[in-house]
């Protein structure tokens, strides 16, 4: 009769060949039922107790199953270094960007930038590395030293005395447990040592190799000879020095370059996007990171299956818990500048500012006519983005483009809390008349105040469904919306994490988590009638990545509301939010009133245009500047120990404190001697430009018009011959003679009869049509200039209070649109305004050349212009 063997299923154990989970025990070993393969990691051990412990049969003989550790060789096969880990993650991020619509050339450019970075780090692609092994850098991870050089780290022992047996020394149960544990350890040690090779035979450690920068950094803490001893210490027995200096002990450049983390991947992608001139700019990359389209939550999905199976242990080895996932615009630009300098990048590629301005105008829901006006400003004097103050700075392309849009809105509407209101009121009245005579198809004018209400309400609506959008624009949302956003991310992370099982933990923790979740879900179901997942899915809208988030997200919400299931949504869209302000007419505000006047004349209306100037009561505060504290080196301080408290306090009150932020009037002038010197330099510069054969400045050609078989230069014609009298628009064909009779009158009687005839004609004319008044800007605006460098938080608050409310709102809205603070955008606006208002010498002669003025006696204005000229 054959022996019937019992089968059993071991927890968290499976066959290495067929992945089976059912095993049979034969002579102390376990074999898979499906394929018959022996499981080496487990073994049955018989434990027999002595007679003095227990007289029962169960006490004399016990069968147990012990688990052996996996072979270290198999574990090392699945281990990867930090460079390999981030290489997989970088490939995953790159694929995400390609799915979002990035150029295919981004793949090759990312590889080139990443290879250049690893080459400079002496990790790979290095010709000077003869051994071919990657060299360790500053703050190298222990897993890299263990995998590459088989180097073990020194682990400090626990403080305190060793644990000893406590309680009654004659306790039989304690003695039995001690004997049982010793027996198991002996059996396990014999099983491990059977047939195994010794450590000295199978494992050979190599000396640690450090990069040049790492040796220079570690040399501050120990001599190089002592560092070599640490490099030869394969078992990590030396505990005198740490081979990982603290972060605060490193220089700023070492921290930003040699400490490999997830931010370096964002930097590599940012440089590659700029090199291929992709539509995705740095601000878009930051928004994708903030919206978690690129996040470390999905890192394990980018790794191979055998590597990702380690889960939390792998993330712990990479020390990802100590790294920040979100980055700011300033931090990323600083890291890009450092890496560009590190890999010897020649220069950045300037993106197409015209297409960038078109995208931002669409995002702000502004009319396309504004794009034509902004493009004319860009073409008038194109920016070079050359910064002569710092090395390898990443230019603010997005901020400069947005500054041009802000400057154009400032010219068209004034933004002084009075001019834009008057312009909007006159445009709103004309729109009411246009709706009466033309209906819904009438060409309505752009109203600035209505557009402000639309943009502000759009912020609130989109923020209700997107918490990242709410944080960027500073919109406060309900706690329920924030909880739903957290739950959506947790559910998404759980779905991705369950593939590898790294989030489940132990069985007890899993059961505890399931029980708590079930209790809370039951309470929510009883109280609110729906679970948390049902509530989240009802109000949750999944937004796809977009380069115009506000425009795309709002249209997505409108589409959801228009559907049949949109009635379940708690939010209500007002009717005025369905108005397309980008389709409004902006031509009359740039003095192109021909089409509007013709349309009104067809309906018996007349248009009168009135230009508005800036406010007269604008405060003249001057130029603002932060004061730097100059500390003298040769100062001597003496303490007066005999002074009384009252005397000391009175002296402090009498002492005048110098402010750190002030406004000064531009009244400074140069001395006669220095002014003569700069005048001579300017004359010498002009003479050199004239004598330079490569300096070709041609005058604007004069156009000839043929009138009555005579060729007449266009510049010689008067305005009465080339422009219309009513609107001063250029004529298609110039007049031969002015329409007004300017000859001298020789017959006074004839003149009297002519005047009587004109009077009779006026009396016979029908009554004058209704006149509509349209107020526009005279293209003059207020200026508040100064120096934004090294300005403090309190100074920014003081400066912000001087801005008009409308300008302050538009400044912060435009800054939040591209993900920066308002100070950076205002600094770019100052660069544009100072160039156009103070630096260009003669606008009337700009057809020949644009010359930055050098010989001016206004010292403060010249200093301001020269400072911002270096940033143009």
UniProtKB/Swiss-Prot annotation:
Organism encoding this protein: Drosophila melanogaster
Keyword check for Nuclease: no
Domain topic, free-text comment: Although it shares weak sequence similarity with GTF2B/TFIIB, displays a similar subdomain organization as GTF2B/TFIIB, with a N-terminal zinc finger, a connecting region (composed of B-reader and B-linker regions), followed by 2 cyclin folds.
Renumbered residue ranges of the record's region B-linker: 73-84
Cellular component, GO annotation: nucleolus; RNA polymerase I core factor complex; RNA polymerase transcription factor SL1 complex
Positions annotated as zinc finger (RRN7-type): 6-40
Residue sites binding Zn(2+) per the record: 15, 18, 32, 35
Any one GO molecular function term: zinc ion binding
UniProt record, GO biological process: nucleolar large rRNA transcription by RNA polymerase I; RNA polymerase I preinitiation complex assembly
Region annotated Disordered, chain positions: 187-206
Cellular location(s): Nucleus, Nucleolus
SS bond partners: none
UniProt KW keywords: DNA-binding, Metal-binding, Nucleus, Transcription, Transcription regulation, Zinc, Zinc-finger
InterPro entries: Rrn7_cyclin_C, TAF1B/Rrn7, TF_Rrn7_Zf
Gene: TAF1B
Start and end residues of each stretch annotated as B-reader: 41-72
N-terminal cyclin fold: region residues: 85-312
The protein, known as: TATA box-binding protein-associated factor RNA polymerase I subunit B
Its job: Component of RNA polymerase I core factor complex that acts as a GTF2B/TFIIB-like factor and plays a key role in multiple steps during transcription initiation such as pre-initiation complex (PIC) assembly and postpolymerase recruitment events in polymerase I (Pol I) transcription. Binds rDNA promoters and plays a role in Pol I recruitment.
The family this protein is said to belong to: Belongs to the RRN7/TAF1B family.
PANTHER family referenced in this protein's UniProt entry, alphabetically: TATA BOX-BINDING PROTEIN-ASSOCIATED FACTOR RNA POLYMERASE I SUBUNIT B
